[in-house]
Structure formats: structure tokens, C-alpha cells
Curated annotation (Swiss-Prot):
Protein name: Large ribosomal subunit protein uL13
Entry-linked PROSITE patterns: RIBOSOMAL_L13 (PS00783)
Taxonomic placement: Bacteria, Pseudomonadati, Spirochaetota, Spirochaetia, Spirochaetales
Source organism (scientific name): Borrelia recurrentis (strain A1)
GO cellular component: cytosolic large ribosomal subunit
GO molecular function list: mRNA binding; structural constituent of ribosome
Length: 149
């Protein structure tokens, strides 16, 4: 006898999912720790009805992204690569040059790398808003403050 008949996939209906807005202050916090806290909220792993194939997570606003810290010598040695898809089109930036040019990019790249690849990951990434300083235009939302280590 096959006892696998009771395994059912749980599907949450979107009308029952209420999305909250969480704000994380990234000043003087380690980049990877901020990214993992944001991922937990974006994926919905903090909710009892988490399913990995649905967007059940909440929205995350990260402020003061330009004041995030790195451990060790990564400020000078961490290299970010991108390619233009043309022959010889490999570009590289250190953390220092990238954060001077676009202060929110290192945090966005770290979070995007932790999300699932594919349509669900792109949908979850749209629920993230990163701001270089404390000024943001989302004050009309009911923001819940989240303390990250």
C-alpha cells in the first residue's frame, strides 16, 4: 500500500494574506546580517503558513544603507563583477567604488543573491525598498520597526 496519499500541498489564497511593512535601520550593522533578516521577512519564513512556492512575505524598507558595515578588509578587497554580454565586456568594482557611486547597490546585490532565481525571486525583490539615508517616501505606510543584530 502506498501511504503517500495524505501528502497535500498547501496553497494560501492571496485574499487571505495581509502584507505588512517592516523598516530596518542598517546604520552600523553588518551587511550580511541585515540581508538575512530582510530575506526572512521577504520570503515569509516568520509566518506559520510559509510555503516556498508562493509570495507570502511582507514588504521591507531598509534605511541608512550607506552606513552599513563590513567585516575584515572587505571594504577594499570585495569585488563585484558584471558583464555587458559583449566579448571582453567584464567590468569589476570594489565595494568602495560601488558604494560611492550607488550606496544602495551592495545591499541590494546581497539580498538579490539570497532570493530564489526565477519569477518568484523577481516578484519578491519588488517587495524590497532600500534607501541610502533615513529619508524615504513610504511614511504613509504603517511601518513596523524591526531590530536586526
Amino acid at each position: 500500500m502506498n501511504k503517500m496519499t495524505n501528502n497535500k500541498t498547501i496553497w494560501m489564497k492571496p485574499r487571505y494574506v495581509k502584507k505588512k511593512w517592516y523598516v530596518i535601520d542598517a546604520s552600523d550593522k553588518v551587511l550580511g546580517r541585515i540581508a538575512t533578516e530582510a530575506i526572512k521577512i521577504l520570503r515569509g519564513k516568520h509566518k506559520p503558513y510559509y510555503t516556498p512556492h508562493q509570495d507570502l512575505g511582507d514588504n521591507v524598507v531598509i534605511i541608512n544603507a550607506s552606513k552599513v558595515k563590513l567585516t575584515g578588509k572587505k571594504y577594499f578587497q570585495k569585488i563585484y563583477y558584471r558583464h555587458s554580454r559583449y566579448p571582453g565586456g567584464l567590468y569589476s568594482d570594489t565595494y568602495r567604488t560601488l558604494s560611492e557611486r550607488k550606496p544602495t547597490a551592495p545591499l541590494e546585490i546581497a539580498i538579490k543573491g539570497m532570493l530564489p532565481k526565477g519569477p518568484l525571486g523577481r516578484e519578491l525583490f519588488r517587495n524590497l525598498k532600500v534607501f541610502a539615508d533615513a529619508n524615504h517616501k513610504l511614511s504613509s505606510q504603517n511601518l513596523y520597526k524591526l531590530e536586526a543584530n
